[in-house]
Amino acid sequence: RGLIHSLMSHALDYMHKQEMPISFLYPYSIPFYRKMGWEIVSDKLSFTVRDTQLPKPRPVSGMVERVSLDSEDYHNVHSYFALQRHGCLIRDNLSWEEYWRWDNDDMIAAVYYTKEHKPLGYVVYYIANDIFHIKEMVYLNIEANYGLWNYITAHFSMIDQVQGDNYSGEPMAYLFEDSEITEKISPYIMARIVNVRDFLEYYPYQIQPEDFKIHFKVHDKMAGWNEGDYMVSWHDGETFCEQVEDNQSINVVELDVNTLTAMLMGYKRPSYLYEHEKIRTEYYMLVWLERLIPVEKPYFSDYF
């Protein structure tokens, strides 16, 4: 345990010196990484849809075409999707290599194109034992969503069910006419803020109230440079964060780096964390926190 603790401490110190604001990892032990400041920030929702529950075809103007796994259109759709979604990894060449590392050779990619042949979505899948296995399904608008499900439903005679994973943080059942599909939620990726001061200063707050300051009192046993008090303020559209001395300031929000990460990443809302005694503050501060922090859950589907 001492060696692993030392290695993790060294890794954090290296990331801090490299000015990396946040660290992500897939945990082999959630309790272990929680002790070191990492926290769950995204879920994986595994779903099973029976063939009789597949959505009825909807009219769309485009079509779905199979493409190679290194298709530029396919990769470009993911890049655009990642830029739109909170917390999504923008894949470089190494990320794409890791994405395919553990998959079988039967994987297929199919892209939805508009009538102008503009790519707007894709599904990556394989079929085995009468099951349509979805590795990833991404769409940029509802037309692409309909088109991809039309494509999946077209395999009705070949399959008994569809299985896949959804990383949006929202259950899918509501969108099906027969909503009695099977969904299982599991914690997925963990993250931790590496540099609290920088993260608080560069964070995209929803509002920038010039007549208001918020005092974060942060606890971080693993990264001593984060332990302390931070005053966040706004002026002329800019955010400022300075480390201050511990005092009897107003608007204090006290929490550990785990909770700060989960809250700012949007995985859990401030009111939820307050109700479960994860943050210590005056009740009126919850209104401010709810207004400041964007309402959007992270989308993270990669593994490393």
Would you name each region that the model predicts?
Residues S29-P31, D70-S71:
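Short acidic/polar capping segments at secondary-structure boundaries
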